[in-house]
Amino acid sequence: MSDDNLAEIRDEKAKKIQHPKGKLTAYERLNLLLDEGSFSEIDQHVTSEENPDGEAVVTGTGTIHGRPVFVFSEDFSVMGGSLGEVVAKKILKVMDHALEARAPIIGIKDSGGARIQEGISSLYGYAQIFKKNVEASGKIPQISVVVGPSAGGAVYSPALTDFIFQVQDIGQLYAVSYTHLTLPTKRIV
């Protein structure tokens, strides 16, 4: 199966989840952002055992008005866009490429936060991403585009970037949900 076919199959599955919510897929977002035909995916075949067809992030490079950029687009249709060890490694790799090329990094955020099933390794992944955000600060432009939830650990990386754009009525940034505050204490906050 070719890389294009794999991406197409994955995107068709994602459309069934995202479109009813009024949201685009990770690939659709990248295709709208980047110059037509310029997207080149990085690490498409890097997956975890839980998600052999693709992980909760699409990473790569492309151009905007002919200028090179590096991108990652979180995929909420795969485990709620949650960050686990493999997702973190893919994001860190594309951030490293951006630093080496002295090109902007654009993160399209649509994530329920840490992949709790993976325990501490998902939190370590966030720590590494935050460290990379700080390392890149003042060296390359870092841009966050919030197109869905950015919960828990997923909220801190955008706060460390240079610019944050948020889709009205759909994009959300929060460290903890209302349910997480009220459920354990049984108190109205």
PLM region spans:
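Terminal-region recognition feature
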Residues: 1-143, 149, 154-156, 160-172, ...
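Conserved small/polar residues in nucleotide/adenosyl-binding loops
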Residues: 179-185
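Short hydrophobic transmembrane-like helices used for membrane targeting/insertion
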Residues: 188-189
